[in-house]
């Protein structure tokens, strides 16, 4: 059943002695691209679509997110992480038992909160996103939308999640 469904999405064609894959999905036009055989003699598609037009819950991704230039992504993400680091370091100085360690290196921030665990906030340049791994709220991905890092899954803002969870940790330690 699954194999049949996949076969209906992608089929291999032989045109003038060369192998090509016809790739089509979700209403987009079919594209011809060279097919390659891997070591297990399976045909694989060499075409990869970089962006999708809908989120994981089926909502349409705003054009602002899809058309974000990579340079602007890096500038905005680096600025956000630098400002976040400054804010968290101030909180760490005021509440050293609650937030003993905050580090930022090469686009990856780690935040240690003994009451909850370790947070990882990192850049994902291929997706132009910032990812959060939180011991409380779990993993989430954020896109730059209207100047804020927002989850397209549920509309939450990265700043709001971090503020809420850090405030919980501080109130728990007092």
From Swiss-Prot:
The transit peptide region is found at 1-21
- Which family does the entry's similarity section mention? Belongs to the frataxin family.
NCBIfam families according to UniProt:
FeS_CyaY, mito_frataxin
Under the GO molecular function aspect, what terms does this record hold? 2 iron, 2 sulfur cluster binding; ferric iron binding; ferrous iron binding; ferroxidase activity; identical protein binding; iron chaperone activity
EC assignment: the record states: 1.16.3.1
**GO annotation (BP), single:** iron ion transport
Q: What organism is the protein native to?
A: Saccharomyces cerevisiae (strain ATCC 204508 / S288c) (Baker's yeast)
The family database entries (Gene3D superfamilies) matched by this protein are listed as:
Frataxin/CyaY (3.30.920.10)
Record annotation: effect of changing residue 97 to A: Impairs resistance to iron-catalyzed oxidative stress, no effect on Fe(2+) delivery and cell growth
Q: Which Pfam families match?
A: Frataxin_Cyay
Report the GO terms under cellular component. iron-sulfur cluster assembly complex; mitochondrial inner membrane; mitochondrial intermembrane space; mitochondrial matrix; mitochondrion
Q: What is this protein called?
A: Frataxin homolog, mitochondrial
Described function = Promotes the biosynthesis of heme as well as the assembly and repair of iron-sulfur clusters by delivering Fe(2+) to proteins involved in these pathways. Plays a role in the protection against iron-catalyzed oxidative stress through its ability to catalyze the oxidation of Fe(2+) to Fe(3+). Can store large amounts of the metal in the form of a ferrihydrite mineral by oligomerization. May be involved in regulation of the mitochondrial electron transport chain.
Q: Does the keyword Ion transport apply?
A: yes
Summarize the impact of residue 141 to A: Impairs cell growth and lowers aconitase activity
């Amino acid at each position: 059943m699954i194999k049949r469904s996949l076969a209906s999405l992608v089929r291999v064609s032989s045109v003038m002695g060369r192998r090509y894959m016809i790739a089509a999905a979700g209403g987009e036009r079919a594209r011809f691209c060279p097919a390659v055989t891997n070591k297990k003699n399976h045909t694989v598609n060499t075409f990869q679509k970089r962006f999708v037009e809908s989120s994981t819950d089926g909502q349409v991704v705003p054009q602002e997110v899809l058309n974000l230039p990579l340079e602007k992504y890096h500038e905005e993400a680096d600025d956000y992480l630098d400002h976040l680091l400054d804010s968290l370091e101030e909180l760490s100085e005021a509440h050293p038992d609650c937030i003993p360690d905050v580090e930022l290196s090469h686009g990856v921030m780690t935040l240690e909160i003994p009451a909850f665990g370790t947070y990882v906030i990192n850049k994902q340049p291929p997706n132009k996103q910032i990812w959060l791994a939180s011991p409380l709220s779990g993993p989430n991905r954020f896109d730059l939308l209207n100047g804020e890092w927002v989850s397209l899954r549920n509309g939450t803002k990265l700043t709001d999640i971090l503020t809420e969870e850090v405030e919980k940790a501080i109130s728990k330690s007092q």
